[in-house]
Structure formats: C-alpha cells, structure tokens
C-alpha cells in the first residue's frame, strides 16, 4: 500500500505539472501538443546539470540548479512552438508533433556527446531530490507541485493576467478590441506551459531512478498529461484529481512484482498500457461534455477583427 501511495504521488505530480502547463497554453488559444518534447528537453537539462555538479555541493543548490535549468530550457524550447503557431500561424498539431520528434533526437545526440560513447544513458544521483516521511521515500517535487498548483489557480482565476489569458482563448477579437495584446498573451501562455512542462520532465526522470536512457524519451507521459488536462476540464484542481486517478494505473507497473498482482503472472507491459487504455475509455464518454477554450488551435489574425 505504501508503495502504491509513493508511486501514485510521484507520477500524479508529474502528470499534474505537465497538464497545468497545457492548461495555460490552451487557455491562451494555443494547443500544446509539444508537451512530450518539452518534458524531454527539461528532463535532459536537469539531468545534465545534476550529473555535472560536484558531489560536495549542497543538495539544495543541486536541486535549485536542476529545476532552474529544466524550467528555462522548457521555456526556450516552447518558444519554437509559440513562434510557429502565433507568428507563422502554422498548424499547431503538426508543429507540436514535429517538436516532439526533434526533442528526442536532440536528447539522444546530447546524451551520447555527454557520455562520449554510443549510449544515450546518463547516470546521476537522485538523493538530493528525495526526502523521507515515516519511512516513505518521496520526491521533493511533491511539495513543489502542490505549491505550483495553488499558484496556478490564483494566477488563472484571481489575477488580471489570468482573466486576460482566458479571454484570448475564448474570444481573441473581443480581447483585442479592449486593448489586450493577444499575441503577447499567447506567448505568455506558451512560455508558462514550457516552464511547467520542463519541470514536469525533470520530476519524471530524476526521482525514480539514477540512470535514464534518453532514447525512450518520457514514454508518452506528455500525451497522457493532455488526457489529464481534458479530463480535468482545463481547471487546476480538477486536473489534480484527474492526475492522481491516472497515476494509480501508471503506478501498477512499478508495484506489480512486489504485491499480490504478481500472482496473476501478467507482463509489466500490460500495466504500462493501463493508463493509456483508461484515458481512451474515459475520454470517449466525457469528450462530448468537454468545455475547451473556444478559440484554442485557431491562429489569431488581427485583420479579421
């Protein structure tokens, strides 16, 4: 039971962070399919910083440096999507898919260059990112994620910025008519998405293991986060609940060998498939009632106002 709680919290926070990133982007009017790639870039940046740090450095500084690197690199990578979608008015789905493929290729090249070999595996210490409560080893990203959840809610629903951001995703022409810079707000939404996606990528890669193979990227977690965002109806606390729900399924693969589930004799691949199967089943029943931002995915043309 403790293992289930541990991995549910670990994966739930990751899904929540990335889904919150998608929420900000889509509330601005930009569909961020590139969350998978942003996670890879953020995870790679954080891992490279962590692996490069001297072992004598204070753990808090290692965590801070890795998180900042992941967040900044995630934001920089998201700028590619923002420029293509907002300035060039490119198809956001195609652009995001291309960035997902590019991210994995970049990660493999940089990882192999870092190792000086043909292996894309990078080893590091994850101890600075872990803490214990009652004998249960947890990720430092759990309290950080809760803080970011509350901040996201406040920013989205209690500030002028959040009101303007949502206006740009619902009716950009009306927002523009009252003096809101739609392009700037959409850039802000995508950048925040990159920030949260990058941190989410680091939270996925580092705490659970001490070696990561970047040939596998983040194994579809970014796409699962999109399902979490939709199931959570683009609302922060709903997203948190949806993330924990899907995280239970994702955790089963990690605990199957050490629980009663081992008696079933099922392959771990079956458990790895469960969250994706659950997402398809749930979304097939709930998609008709989804209330997505009305202008998401639609490039804004100032001349058509």
Regions found by a protein language model. Give the residues of each.
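Short, non-helical or kinked segments that cap or interrupt transmembrane helices
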Residues: 24-45, 86-99, 164, 209-223, ...
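Alpha-helical transmembrane segments within multi-pass membrane transporters and channels
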Residues: 57-102, 147
